[in-house]
Amino acid sequence: KIRLFNTQNGEIYVGLLDKVIQFCKDHEYSYEFIENKFYGLPFEVNDMISKEGVKDYMTSVSKYAPREYQIEGVYDALKHNRRLLISPTASGKSLMIYSLVRYHVERGQNTLIVVPTTSLVEQMYKDFADYGWDVGSYCHKIYAGRERETDSQVIITTWQSIYKLPRKYFARFNVVVGDEAHQFKSKSLISIMTKLGDAKFRYGFTGTLDGT
């Protein structure tokens, strides 16, 4: 059973914040947002991000020209710090993930990319190389039998390889990207996301949502 509200510490998932606000309004409760050193304020918007700037950036970091919907997706994600993006099969999802990762790496931030299978770890790594990046200098792959400790800025891993690791392992990550995000309802994946307490930037990609 998955509990969305922690009665011990009063925490609730930020994705439910709009429902909490509506509840307060319906019952005429007052509320206040207090700035957090990691997250800032809820619904924070990055005014420095522009669609034209995102287009130019994506073009500069990849040898493939981005499509309009890819630019729109990356722009929306960077503008709001956290987004769930619907990206069907063959829509160029990895280019969007790659662009987000490159943006954060250039700002000295560490990124954790979580995928469901070993083959997707390898595919993501290969795609990043195909886009023209020196992946060996920045990315580390984790799945069964591979070393989990690394100084690399970017880790591409299956969730099965890391969900049992202690919270301190996740402390260095500023960014998390979840592929096949519709699977993130499972307790193991929720455990990973909860341990990423310092990750202000959270992006999910999925080809489908089941409405739950």
Residue ranges and their predicted role:
Residues T111, T118-G145:
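Conserved helix-turn-beta segment of the N-terminal RecA-like "Helicase ATP-binding" lobe
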